[in-house]
Amino acid sequence: MMIPELPDYLTGLGGREYLGLIIALFTLTAGLSRPFSGKITDTVGRVPVMAFGSLVCFVCGFLYPYLLTVWGFLVLRLIHGFSTGTKPTATAAYVADVVPANRRGEAMGTLGLFTAMGMSIGPAIGSWLATGYSMNVMFWTSSAFALLSIGILLRMPETLVNPQPFRFSLLRLKKAEIFDKQALPPFVVLLLQSFSYGAVITLISTLSTSLGIANKGLFFTVYTLASLGVRLVFSRSSDRYGRVPVLLVSSVMLVMSMALLIMAQTPIIFWTAALLYGFSSGMNAPTIQAWTADLADEATRGRAMATMYIALEAGIGLGALGSGWLLNHLLGQAGLSASFGLSSVLALVATGYLGWLWHRDRQPDRRQVRSTDDTALLNGEP
């Protein structure tokens, strides 16, 4: 709800040079809190971690109108990041708990469907509230939705078997609890792909203004509606055809979307890029969550999800910082083109990596083939 209006809001406070920090600070604490949220999710439970994330959203949304300095705003963005560092981790683990493995892609798609609905409606409502009423009304409305979320969560049953009471000693992490090596392939893919989202949420309001589009939230509405459509039609695609092939298609669409944003001199190209970005997101998000759950052990599912989300936050944060820096040092269209160009290149690298994984998985295991041949020879078979 807030994202499209925050760049102008920070500029109004006198902090235009800090636009990249709006997302970077948010994703910094989100990323740092992921290992902790993963461990707490696997020990204390899914529901308490989800409720904590919603509580952070409620408090921060309420406080934004009262911190009227650049540094006060940035500190609050830093704190607000704990919400994203906790709730999605526990939510993904919760969904993976309650559905069978052969329908995991469909379930993650349904989760993403409702997430996308909020993301499509939220920015448009946020811009409408900020323009028609005030930024404060937008902030408080966001806080009210977070409070409603808490009320729903408190009525949900816990899915973790034998949850433990919270104790501060759980916040002491061992090295092995920070990163789940089994989630490395999704980590690499998402790190490369999510740079583009950091660039989009930092720069799309500037690009919208340059094209004469008044409502800066409409790009998010279009891409999220496209994402909704993909999730509705192709919700079981990764369950049928495999995670990597679906991710490969979505990555190609991401490259195309970023390439179009480089060339976006007219609204038609702009909206086409938004559609492709939505198609990519609609296929990518549920599939990479299901892929991570497939690779993880049941006992460390929260940690694996946290590892995946660390890549998401790191990529978004780097994308926001990098695009903000490029916009400030390469003014105008040059800064926009450089940012979206870099996003396109990184997405292309992710596409190549997925292509290699797809090719590798299609090849028979050479050691297994050799072992079968040796056994046949020992048995006197031709």
Task: Annotate the PLM regions.
Residues 144-162, 353-358:
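C-terminal membrane-cytosol helix-exit motif in multi-pass small-molecule transporters
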Residues 32-65, 241:
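Conserved MFS/SLC helix-loop-helix module at the cytosolic interface between two early adjacent transmembrane helices
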Residues 78-115:
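Cytoplasmic helix-loop-helix junction between adjacent transmembrane helices
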Residues 49-62, 143, 245-259:
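Structural signature of the two symmetry-related core transmembrane helices
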Residues 131-143, 325-346:
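A membrane-interface helix-boundary motif in multi-pass transporters
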Residues 1-22, 185, 189, 194-207, ...:
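Helix-loop boundary and gating motifs at the non-cytosolic
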Residues 27-35, 119-120, 224-228, 232, ...:
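Residue-level signature of mid-helix packing/kink "hotspots" within the transmembrane helices
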Residues 158-190, 373-380:
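Juxtamembrane intracellular "pre-TM" segments in multi-pass secondary transporters
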